[in-house]
Amino acid sequence: MGGKLSKKKKGYNVNDEKAKEKDAKTEGASAEESEAPKENKEDAAAATETTNDTAAAAKEATPTADSNSTAPKEEEKSAAPPKKEEPAANANANAPKASDAKTSEAAKAEPAKSPDAPPVKAEEKSAPSAAPANEKEPAKEAAKDPAPAVAAASESKPDAESKKTEAPPTKESAPAEPITTETSPAPNKEQAVAVQD
């Protein structure tokens, strides 16, 4: 953690970012670490403590998703046993720093993506899987009556928004309708062929 590079000592303009990056790489530290203020590292440590519960569950759900996050090396050395939890917490800290509700929503969204979710997240994962199962039934009804399909879709959207899984239910209900319409024209073609023969 050296001090700022002086203009006279290095022989280049202070605003020259490429030259700074080269010097930082030759010294053995990346440009991001050398320019990062100490306050950001302290904020990341505080965010790690506050999001430990959600980060632990999220890390179990996605073991390698946060490997690209730039965590301070000092934190990794001091907290070696919970090292698996830190990248997830730092990724949440590096993401737009908002309320804990957003981090919990992100943690809820991750188990839906990953197949191996922890037992704690199994309840949350079963709830989103129950919603698509319920939406398949209205999709079947949609083939019969278009009006109930609109009502079923409007009922399922608030549930989907609260679970942050709005896109998959929409995709499931949309293909169900074209499949039924595609199967109905096929017999019509066969009937037309049968009539022509």
From Swiss-Prot:
N-myristoyl glycine lipid sites: 2
Record Pfam families: BASP1
GO cellular component: plasma membrane
Stretch list, region Disordered: 1-197
Cellular localisation: Cell membrane
Keyword match Membrane: yes
Keyword Cell membrane part of the UniProt annotation: yes
Feature: compositional bias, Low complexity: 45-66, 88-98, 145-155
Keywords: Cell membrane, Lipoprotein, Membrane, Myristate
Sequence ranges of Basic and acidic residues compositional bias: 15-26, 35-44, 72-87, 99-113, 134-144, 156-166
Protein name per UniProt: Brain acid soluble protein 1 homolog
Organism: Danio rerio
